[in-house]
Amino acid sequence: MERNHTMTTTTRSRPSRITPQINNQLDMFDLLTLAEPITAPLSFTVDPYTPEEHHKACERWRIEHRNLGIWGKSHMWHCSGYDFGNNRTVAGGHPTVLMSADTRCDHYYPATCSCVGDLLYRMHCEGCGHVTGIHARENAAVEEHLDHCWNGWRNLPTITRKGQDGPWKIPDDYPTEWQIEGAPVRTLRQPMGTRHVPGRSPFGGYDAGTLSP
């Protein structure tokens, strides 16, 4: 007895980049985001936009392309953990947002290239609107911001704290004008741990690491 085998071919239509689908249904939150106008470009730019403008542009890119390689492929400015308050300071009159952009290529060893991209940083002050230049080092962007918004911070005496999460030891003669909300502090560090940390100052500003008092 012979059996007839019928092969059925199903043609799948490619989902639209502009109308993402989740389980064959449109994500209403994505649709609402797509309806909002954006002002920042969906790529790297040297022009200064606000962190909120960059954030909306990143959300648009995520919806159109999904999350796969968003930073390496788009090269857009973004703030890691923007929605959760990471890489930000919120105290005082000069709250900040640290933005970064990955302009590096995706070539891996042993492939060679002549790309000149790098991991770049710039700082936005949401208080006075100051935007730093573009830097290849995070600390350099932070220091430019501090020089503009907290002029004189480099001359502050260093302070210490008891343990990683213990109380800060602020000398009795520490300048009172620098004991205000949002002010940065300087702390002595080891050579491999000099990153300036946002929000870790006892006043809510930057904890700027230094190797010398």
Where are the regions that the model predicts?
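Short aromatic-glycine-(Arg/Gly/Cys) micro-motifs in beta-strand/loop hairpins
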Residues: 106-131
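Intrinsically disordered, low-complexity, charge-dense segments enriched in Lys/Arg
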Residues: 67-101, 122, 154-213
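Secreted/processed peptides and extracellular or luminal domains of membrane proteins
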Residues: 64, 85, 111-113, 131-134, ...
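Extended, solvent-exposed polar beta/coil surface segments
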Residues: 78, 83-86, 132-137, 141
